[in-house]
């Protein structure tokens, strides 16, 4: 869109092969894609589909199911986690992808205090990323105290930045204003919506992480846009969405019933509404 480019995260969760999905995204109007790394996927097909469609590959999402193991004192566990992250970093290098998104934790119980093992393991990842000219974007998820520790540990390192997931902020981080804290280090966005924390006692759980289309949840997008405008300017604002409902929930059901072309068109419509807000000045002009 004029004055603000948009992108969308792509993965196998959409039910069509990722290269085909990328081509559909290109025809819809987005300017960039951000694929999810899979160890056994042929990324060359995805990269070629993006090139043919005139889409930038804005970032690569590193594997996240191994995030907790990066803090483990068990060298076998942490070594396997680091191995996968380094493999995904190799993909970034091979295809000139400038940013790799990394989760710092996965899980809601037994979250450890920041420890030397974690700093050492993430340090190895960051060092290799520096060699490759790839930036590491730590994403806000559960375990926000670990995010804070890593962002402080790598403060001043130009190869480490912040990936802001607007939905995670509401359903995992108790609506803490993370852009006020890390907006000057913002290098990637995962924009999406949800209904906040469902439990009255404030306990967080993964089934609240809906990844709805913007404006289908309770997010205040004027507030979000105002905060993004104060943060480091992004060439692309990226949307990370989901067409599948979480177990025993049905908020995303209607998305899955749509033809994929219609869903992507609606996603682009919502992205343009936010891009328009981003491009406006305070007096409403461009």
Predicted regions span which residues?
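N-terminal pre-domain/capping segments
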Residues: 1-87, 93, 258-286
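Acidic (Asp/Glu)-rich catalytic clusters
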Residues: 1-2, 22-27, 41-61, 87-96, ...
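Hydrophobic faces of well-ordered beta-strands that scaffold small-molecule active sites
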Residues: 4-10, 33-35, 57-62, 100-102, ...
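Acidic-and-aromatic substrate-binding clefts and catalytic sites of carbohydrate-active enzymes
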Residues: 12-18, 32-45, 69, 107-113, ...
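A short, acidic, flexible beta-alpha connecting loop/helix-capping segment that sits on the rim
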Residues: 13, 238-259
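Conserved, mostly hydrophobic/aromatic
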Residues: 25, 33, 50, 92, ...
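Active-site acidic/histidine proton-transfer and metal-coordination neighborhood
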Residues: 52, 71-162, 251, 262
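Acidic/histidine-rich catalytic cores of soluble enzymes
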Residues: 123-218
């Amino acid at each position: 869109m004029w004055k603000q480019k948009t992108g969308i995260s792509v993965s196998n969760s959409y039910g069509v092969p990722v290269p085909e999905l990328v081509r559909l995204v290109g025809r819809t109007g987005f300017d960039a894609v951000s694929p999810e790394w899979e160890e056994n996927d042929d990324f060359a097909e995805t990269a070629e589909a993006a090139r043919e469609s005139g889409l930038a590959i804005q970032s690569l999402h590193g594997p996240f199911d191994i995030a907790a193991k990066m803090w483990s004192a068990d060298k076998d566990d942490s070594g396997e986690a680091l191995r996968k992250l380094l493999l995904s970093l190799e993909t970034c290098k091979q295809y000139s992808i400038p940013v790799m998104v990394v989760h710092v934790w996965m899980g809601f119980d037994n979250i450890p205090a920041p420890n030397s093992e974690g700093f050492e393991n993430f340090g190895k990842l960051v060092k290799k990323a520096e060699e490759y000219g790839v930036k590491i974007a730590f994403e806000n998820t559960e375990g926000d105290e670990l995010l804070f520790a890593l962002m402080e540990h790598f403060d001043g390192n130009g190869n480490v930045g912040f990936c802001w997931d607007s939905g995670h902020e509401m359903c995992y981080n108790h609506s803490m204003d993370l852009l006020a804290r890390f907006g000057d280090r913002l290098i990637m966005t995962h924009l999406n919506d949800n209904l906040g924390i469902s439990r009255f006692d404030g306990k967080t759980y993964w089934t609240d992480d809906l990844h709805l289309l913007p404006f289908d949840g309770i997010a205040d997008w004027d507030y979000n846009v105002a905060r993004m405008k104060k943060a480091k300017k992004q060439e692309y604002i990226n949307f990370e969405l989901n067409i599948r409902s979480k177990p025993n929930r049905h908020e995303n059901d209607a998305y899955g019933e749509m033809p994929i072309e219609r869903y992507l068109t609606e996603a682009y419509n919502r992205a343009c509404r936010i891009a328009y807000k981003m491009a406006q000045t305070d007096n409403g002009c461009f």
